[in-house]
Each structure stands twice: as structure tokens, then as C-alpha cells.
Amino acid sequence: KRDEDGIVLVDQDRCHGYRFCVEACPYKKVYFDPLRQVSTKCIFCLPRIEEGVAPACARQCPGRLRLVGYLDDEAGPIWKLVHKYRVALPLHPEFELGPNVFYVMPMSPPKLDAQGRPTDEPRIPTSYLVSLFGERVPEVLATLEAERAKRRSGEPSELMDLLIAYDWNQNFALGPRKREVL
């Protein structure tokens, strides 16, 4: 993990292809490249980051689902989603690895019964989300639903504005400091 930006890299020159890192990665993001005979992973478009350009996945995402910024920038969207609204969670917080990636729970429509009517049951089971993101999931889902209800009733919601991302340029704040991704 690089100190200057938090990006985790696999040293291709030192890798012997034993695949221990593939097995050890708690996030299951390292894979074995059979052509080069080394383990590898996403490098977060490091050459782009070094030029101050957003990673390709974030820049090209049609749903504007990826935000890139600094966790300590109180004016930025990452800080607000993680600290102010507390709706962005790390994957597997029980590992206590200080991840650079945070997730906002998906708000899916309810399940439908056999007759096609909506039920009170979520399409993605809450228990499954808890297994991925920890015990705060129900609290996060309640916050998201309350903010969505505010917006539906015509009230303003900074949280919904952040998640809708009308101005996608505000989703990217890059530079030489540590960055977090959502």
C-alpha cells in the first residue's frame, strides 16, 4: 500500500507466481495472470492518478456510481458520505484493514409476490448486506430511505444531491494526498 495515495500494488518484479497473495487477499481482488505467470490486481489506473485524472472506471461510469476524493476533505463528497451522513461503509469492516474503498448500500425496489404485488421484503436481503458491510447496514438503509422520502415530498436533501451527482466533475478530487474511493 503506497503511503502517498493508499493504492495497493503487487510488485511484479518480486512476484514468483506462487499465488499466496491470491489466497490471502481478504477482498478477493488479486488474481493470477496465467500469461505472465504473476499475481496482479487493479492498479486504480495509477498513471492517470499521477496526472490528476480520474480512474477510467470512475470517469466512464454511466451511472456516476464512483466518486474519488479525500477522506479528510470535509467539503468533499467522500467525507460527507462517510462521516457526516454515515451512509458509506467499508467492505468487511471486521477485517479492520483501513480500506480505501467505501460503499453506499443499494436501494432496490421491494420483492414482488406471486401475483406481482410489492411486498415488505427487500429484494437484496438485509442479512446478506450485513454479512458484507457489518452491523450498521440497517441504520444506513433507514437513513437513505428517510432522505429519499424527504426528496419525494419536495424537501431538499444534500445527501440525495451527493448521490445523484448532477455535476459529475465534483465526484473527482485528485492530488498527492491520500484518497478514498466510493
What are the roles of these predicted feature ranges?
Residues 1-59, 71-73:
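Ferredoxin-like iron-sulfur electron-transfer modules
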Residues 56-182:
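Long, compositionally biased charged/polar accessory segments in the mid-to-C-terminal portions
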